[in-house]
Every structure is written in structure tokens, then in C-alpha cells.
């Protein structure tokens, strides 16, 4: 939601609350549907506490789904048809990760079967959502868009989302290996994946410095990168016991 709001600020447009409501509810729905589609046959026999806890409180998933459907239905009546079509496209791209629509090595499944695709798929979906959705609604409402700024912003957003997502993959290396899910982190190993995080921080910061953004926004985004770098270096990758500190990236 915050990233979608930032898109409006970068383009110096008034924030559309209905787009933010769609962003929030659609994200919650996709996460919850992802959980349901990946539900093991016997969740309580899982080796992972997170899986056992989630499905021992499955009623919370359904409550959230019902609430989000209601709020989403309210919001979609306040945006243009072109925006709804684009939202449906983003939703289709998102669920393609879990839905068994393809075959790979003789097995039917979704994009999650392809080695290393998870990280890039998440970053793509979030970029399409937090950058593309506000812009599509602005275009449908008759606003002129600076396409150089749009593509530059989309590229930076994709890099930033890679940076924010990779530490979660590093945290989940053991669990993903247990489920035979070949993420970029499992393919590279923890040390090389951690190094890649630092490289993305520096690349993203360098591109920010020459970005066609207002100076105050540029300074704020560079400071956010500095905070991310400190979190990665001093807390997230350093602490092996409390690896749930990776969730601090959400606040950064």
C-alpha cells in the first residue's frame, strides 16, 4: 500500500484511496489463497511451526478472505473498467505461481516448479501492482503520464522488491529445500545470496542518485536504502537465532 502511495507522490498526483484499498485487500487475498493452495495433506505433521500454526487457525484465513472480498468489492466500483481489466491480469500472473497449469519434468504444477523463479515472480507481481495499477487508473482518468519516469520507476521498484524479498528466501532455505522448492537462495547458498543483497542495495542506490525524482523524495529513498543496509549488516544476516528479524524489512 505504501509503495503504491509512493508512486502517486513521485508522479505528483493526488493519492487515490480506492486504489490503495484494492492494493491492500488484493494482496491479503493472494497471500491467503497462496496458503490454501499450498496446504499439505496433514498440516499438523509438518516439520515447521509456521505451517502448523497457520492451519491450526485456518478460520482466521477464511475470516480475512471474506472481509477482504467485501472491501475489494466496494473499492472496484470506484475505479475505471480499464483498471479492473489490468487488476485481473495482475491477479492471473500472481496465481500462476501456484496453479497447476503447466508441466515440468513430467509433473504438473505452477511456476513455482521452475528453479529460481520465485524471487523474480514476486518482484514482478508487486511491481505490476504498486507501479502499474496507479498509473493505469491515472491514464484511464485522462492524466498525462511521463513514460520515461514510469519505466525508470518500474525498474527501480523491481530492484527494490528483489532486495526486500531475497532475505526471506535466505531465511527459508531449509524449509524450501525440505519441500524441494529451488529458490534463488537455495541455488546460490546463504553466503552468495547475502552478498547479492548487498550488491542490489548499491546498484539501487546508484540508480536513485540519477533518478528523475524530486530531490526531497530522492533523499528519503536513499536514506531508506541506508536503513536497509544497516538492518542487513548489523541485525538480519548477523543474527542466526532470531531470524524473524527479517520482518523488519517490511517497516523499512
Predicted regions and their residues:
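Interhelical loop and helix-boundary elements at the membrane-water interface
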Residues: 1, 40-64, 98-124, 183-193, ...
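N-terminal transmembrane signal-anchor/hairpin module of polytopic inner-membrane proteins
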Residues: 1-67
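Helix-coil boundary and interhelical linker segments in multi-pass alpha-helical membrane proteins
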Residues: 2-22, 72-85, 130-155, 207-219
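Alpha-helical membrane-inserting segments
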Residues: 3, 7, 11, 30-37, ...
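Transmembrane helix-loop-helix
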Residues: 15-19, 61-104, 198-243
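Acidic (Asp/Glu-rich) catalytic motifs at the cytosolic membrane interface
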Residues: 23-45, 160-184
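Alpha-helical transmembrane segments of multi-pass integral membrane proteins
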Residues: 90-93, 119-134, 155-168
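A loop-to-helix transmembrane entry motif
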Residues: 152-156, 184-200
